[in-house]
Amino acid sequence: MAENNFPPLPRFIPLKPCFYQDFNEIPDQHRTMCKRLYYLWILNSATLAVNLIGCLAWMCGGGGATNFGMAILWLILFTPCSYVCWFRPIYKAFKSDSSFNFMAFFFVFMAQVVISIIQTVGIPGWGVCGWLATITFFSTNIGSAVVMLIPTIMFTAVAVLSFIALTKVHNFYRGSGGSMSKAQEEWTSGAWKNPHVQQAAQQAAMGAAQGAMQGQQYSAAPTYNYDDPM
């Protein structure tokens, strides 16, 4: 079994990586989408970090410490939770063509989209520099509001990209014949947690794709029949 390599922690930290991540084990036809979702997770995490700075400016401008404290919780909790709860399921889904993991991704990522929209709105007291909080604070402190505007724009980008990603993955899943009943069958049989079954499904999918490509390659080649003269 491969050694865990994510997150890549410095050697002086007395902790070891918790997950194994290698995009080369994702089938070619899914690798680009999987990487884009990973970059979306990075953008979401970076947005939460920038939001912490925005809430610090908010507090320094007279906005109170509640938002800054909530921003710390957003960053500490949602950065690892979003990776574990929606990126890992879609990573496994693309890797082994698992309907159960696709359903887990859809369930959590829909909540992620809703949260991103709430963050974009920016309700005061929630620890996020959204549009409502930023625009109203311009009348109090323009300098702080300008700093708050940066995470506001980033939250908007995350919300839009998350909705687009959810739509694309859903269209792909339904187009490939996936359904809730298939996910229930995997849950009942326990195939979703069996690495041997997952590996076999992955190999079968890759073999089918290679066979289709070879069939297209040789379908145009002429065939000759020879009669035995003996």
From Swiss-Prot:
Q: Where in the cell is it found?
A: Cell membrane; Golgi apparatus membrane; Golgi apparatus, trans-Golgi network membrane; Recycling endosome membrane
Membrane topology field: Multi-pass membrane protein
Question: What is the superkingdom listed in this entry's lineage?
Answer: Eukaryota
Is Isomerase included in the keywords of this UniProt record?
Answer: no
Pfam families in the record, alphabetically? SCAMP
| Residue ranges, Extracellular side | 58-64, 123-145
> Which parts of the sequence lie on the Cytoplasmic side of the lipid bilayer?
1-36, 86-99, 167-230
Q: Spell out the InterPro entries in the cross-references.
A: SCAMP
What's a BP term from Gene Ontology annotated to this protein? positive regulation of cytokine production
Is-annotated flag, keyword Chaperone? no
Positions of transmembrane segments: 37-57, 65-85, 100-122, 146-166
Q: What is this protein called?
A: Secretory carrier-associated membrane protein 5
State the encoding gene.
scamp5
